[in-house]
C-alpha cells in the first residue's frame, strides 16, 4: 500500500512538466508575436526548453514505475 502512495506522490512531477511546457511555449508565442522576424531563430531554443521540461516529467514517471513494480 505504501509503495502505491509513494508512486502517486512521484507523479506530481508530471503536473510540473505540463506547467513547464506551457510556460515555455506561452513565452515563446508572446515573444514571436512581438517580434515575428526573430521567431525562426528562436525555434531551436523553444525545442530545447520543451525537452528539458518534459524530461523532468518522464523522470518522475519512471520513478513512479520503479516504486510500483521494482520495490
UniProtKB/Swiss-Prot annotation:
GO terms for cellular component: plasma membrane; proton-transporting ATP synthase complex; proton-transporting two-sector ATPase complex, proton-transporting domain. Its main location: membrane. The record marks 54 as: Reversibly protonated during proton transport. One of its GO terms (molecular function) is lipid binding. It is found in: Cell inner membrane. Keywords: ATP synthesis, Cell inner membrane, Cell membrane, CF(0), Hydrogen ion transport, Ion transport, Lipid-binding, Membrane, Plasmid, Transmembrane, Transmembrane helix, Transport. The keyword Transmembrane applies. The keyword Transmembrane helix applies. The chain crosses the membrane at residues 4-24, 46-66. It is a multi-pass membrane protein. Disulfide bonds: none annotated. Belongs to the ATPase C chain family. F(1)F(0) ATP synthase produces ATP from ADP in the presence of a proton or sodium gradient. F-type ATPases consist of two structural domains, F(1) containing the extramembraneous catalytic core and F(0) containing the membrane proton channel, linked together by a central stalk and a peripheral stalk. During catalysis, ATP synthesis in the catalytic domain of F(1) is coupled via a rotary mechanism of the central stalk subunits to proton translocation. Key component of the F(0) channel; it plays a direct role in translocation across the membrane. A homomeric c-ring of between 10-14 subunits forms the central stalk rotor element with the F(1) delta and epsilon subunits. F-type ATPases have 2 components, F(1) - the catalytic core - and F(0) - the membrane proton channel. F(1) has five subunits: alpha(3), beta(3), gamma(1), delta(1), epsilon(1). F(0) has four main subunits: a(1), b(1), b'(1) and c(10-14). The alpha and beta chains form an alternating ring which encloses part of the gamma chain. F(1) is attached to F(0) by a central stalk formed by the gamma and epsilon chains, while a peripheral stalk is formed by the delta, b and b' chains. This is ATP synthase subunit c 1. It comes from Cereibacter sphaeroides (strain ATCC 17029 / ATH 2.4.9) (Rhodobacter sphaeroides). The gene is atpE1.
